[in-house]
Regions:
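Active-site activation/catalytic loop segments of kinase-like enzymes and analogous catalytic loops
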Residues: 162-195, 208-228
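ATP-dependent phospho-/nucleotidyl transfer catalytic cores
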Residues: 19-24, 50-131
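Active-site acidic catalytic loop and adjacent metal/ATP-binding pocket
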Residues: 112-162
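ATP/Mg2+ or Mg2+-diphosphate-binding catalytic cores
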Residues: 215-256
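Conserved NTP-binding catalytic cores of kinases and kinase-like/nucleotidyltransferase enzymes
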Residues: 1-8, 145-147, 255-256
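ATP-binding pocket architecture of kinase catalytic cores
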Residues: 1-59
Length: 256
């Protein structure tokens, strides 16, 4: 980094020329999955630390989604309460209020099931971690004539590989209206390089099952000014509801 005479610090990067992964191109998306699997395979490790007298042995812990989901559920309930008390509602608010109950029921059930699985999983017994990219999305996957490469590792951290896999897979499935054939092909591309173990498959299933897209829509609405609601919010909600049947179908296929 460099600092100018006013004390403002800048980070200088060497930037590579390339274009973003084309999310409409099936083969490019599958290659992005294989690239991710290769990254995880190369960066896998089992945490071991030498014992030192008087110094506690550090422990690397996996991110537990259920804790974040519990927080999201509280935020959804708060927004639902606000909507019920609001006397004059816009069309968006009427639509949102009508679907909150079933989505919240689903979110609560998923959270409880996932907590039981997390609690029964022995995370101390030589668990394998990897260094995750942390923001593995198509705009960080660039292509040159020589092939794909990754940029923006600022969020890189030690965690389970599903952190990256879930993010990219969910984005690609949303863009393809949760096409089951495409979803299975993308997952198969990843597993052709690095197969998932049973716990990782459960992890992926529950992350995809949680209605995170609805939470994002609700969270943006609740924390912004409600006098004027962008038309984009309505479009996102409509698209979410249109895709729900296809999403459920894919989850039935994925369920361990």
């Amino acid at each position: 980094s460099v600092t100018d005479r006013d004390g403002v610090r800048y980070i200088l990067k060497t930037w590579w020329e390339g274009r973003e992964c084309n999310i409409r191109d099936r083969e490019e998306c599958m290659e992005a999955m294989r690239l991710l699997a290769g990254l995880h395979k190369d960066l896998e490790f089992i945490p071991t630390f030498p014992e030192m007298e008087g110094i506690p042995t550090p422990v690397i812990r996996r991110f537990l989604p259920s804790r974040e989901y519990e927080k999201h559920n509280k935020e959804l309930k708060r927004a639902r309460r606000f909507l019920k008390q609001r006397s004059q509602k816009t069309w968006f608010e009427i639509r949102l209020a009508a679907v909150m109950d079933p989505f919240l029921e689903e979110a609560g059930q998923i959270c409880e099931e996932w907590k039981k699985i997390e609690n029964s999983h022995d995370v101390e017994a030589g668990e394998t971690f990897c260094f995750c990219h942390g923001d593995y999305q198509y705009h960080n996957i660039l292509r040159q004539d020589r092939g794909f490469f990754l940029v923006n590792f600022e969020k890189c951290q030690a965690d389970g590989p599903i952190r990256d896999l879930y993010l990219l897979l969910r984005k690609l499935l949303e863009k393809s209206d949760w096409d089951c054939n495409r979803g299975e092909a993308l997952l198969a591309a990843y597993e052709s390089v690095r197969p998932l173990n049973p716990f990782e498959r459960q992890d992926l299933f529950y992350r995809l099952s949680y209605p995170e897209k609805l939470w994002k829509i609700v969270n943006f609405y609740y924390n912004s000014g409600k006098a004027w609601i962008p038309e984009k919010n309505q479009e996102k909600l409509d698209r979410l509801l249109e895709q729900e049947t296809a999403r459920k179908k894919f989850l039935r296929i994925l369920r361990p």
